[in-house]
Amino acid sequence: LHPMVIMGAVLGAITFCLQGCVQWDGTHIALSMIMLSLLCTIFFIPAMPGAGYEVRGNGEMFPLNGPCWSLFFEYLGNILYALFIHRLSNKALAVLTILLGVALASFAIFDISGYGNMGVGWTLDGINFGGGLLRMLFPFSMGMLLSRNFKPIKVKGAFWICAIALVTLFSVPYLEGATPVCTNGIYEAFCVIIAFPVLVWLGASGTTTVSYTHLRAHETTLHLV
């Protein structure tokens, strides 16, 4: 994915310059800071909020390619996997996954970020970095646990079940209510911790009549999409 990161950073820098090299409040940014931001993005060095190379002024880790924050945490997850997580037994991994699930649920339900949702991790400001780690570590550990213990079950129409379930879950609007607990946080925690892992299990258990050769023939198109 890193070639795409570089491409996105270059396009971000070009777009920022075409827009006049200004932040949201109209402050002009020196070209040297834009080039420094580009270099940091290419080498995946996150920007500190308020730093000169945090050119957009929103506190983003990667102002020239905002979505890179997600891949940044995935890189951290892979490093942790290589150093520690892959050594864990199934029982230890299950305990870790449960603890991370409880931590993530608490973060969302008690609205630790103050956002009313799990939309954290895009900045190093405040609780965002810790929240971003939780957002990455729980699904990462849960995915490993599912992979190690996966046993397909017989389910007819797995594709349609999963598709309808996802459309239904994604159709739910933001849920108001922040006291005593965050209603929207409860819903998002349910989706991430319970619903999505179950859907992954069901989807992996499904069968298809499409051949592997047919899928390979359309691989390039799928990547572009």
Residue ranges and their predicted role:
Residues I14, G50-E54, F84-L88, G119-R216, ...:
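Alpha-helical transmembrane segments in multi-pass integral membrane proteins
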Residues A94-D111, C162-V167:
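Small-polar-interrupted transmembrane alpha-helices in polytopic inner-membrane proteins
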Residues M4-F73, A103-G119, G126, F190-A204:
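Membrane-interface helix-loop-helix regions
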Residues E60-I85, G132, M136-F138:
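Function-critical hydrophobic alpha-helical transmembrane segments in multi-pass membrane proteins
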Residues I6, L18, I79-L80, N149:
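Generic hydrophobic alpha-helical membrane-span motif
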Residues L38-I42, Y75, I79, L83, ...:
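Hydrophobic alpha-helical segments of integral membrane proteins
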